[in-house]
Amino acid sequence: IKDACEQHYKDIGHDKSNLDVTFENVQARERTQILMDISNKIGGLVVGTGDLSELALGWCTYNGDQMSMYGVNASIPKTLVRGILESYAQHHNELRETLLDICDTPVSPELLPPNEDGTIKQKTEDKIGSYVIHDFILYYMQRHGFGPRKIFDLYINAKTMHEKKMGVENPVIDKADVLKNMEIFYNRFWTQQFKRSCMPDGVKVGSVSLSPRGDWRMASDACQSIWIDELNELKNI
């Protein structure tokens, strides 16, 4: 896609040395355009790669990877994707090395140049926080209707029990970091609904789905202030 993207940067007057959101989204949309056109050419379908966690956070480019002809991962959270790959690798020796390498690679949209040593520069969780926390919130919010305070308490208790099970006698949980991740989740979940309102069809695998034609109908201009206010109260405890 290099030539097509560089031509587009020229067409819209964008300096390609400016590695901003426009630089990234041009690539994401060009990928999608090419896939759509090739699918027409061969009579196929563009299979979406986006998962449930990315849909919840709006971590996708509108009319880029947000769009496909069928979203096979639309109801599978990011943390479960890793678990599925690890489980599949255990039973398929011919793919084990490749799948485990994928699991060990930091999650990234790979839209920015790498570091000088060739390592990934753009790491998703450095930008939007922990998928473990986000998936925990999503499940208890969407499936059970719990608010921030209850989800916070549940997460702290679950994390503490997990640490003890792993041999940590007196685990210390960074509550401020948990609240920071929760704030990111609630802000992004509410402001990114417009991407879910026009998401493509997909399969529902588990008990949680964000399809506007199924389990989740929400106005794109809904306000998250009630949930953020409750989080702010937790910060002051």
Predicted regions and their residues:
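ATP/NTP-dependent adenylation/nucleotidyl-transfer catalytic domains that generate, transfer
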Residues: 1-237
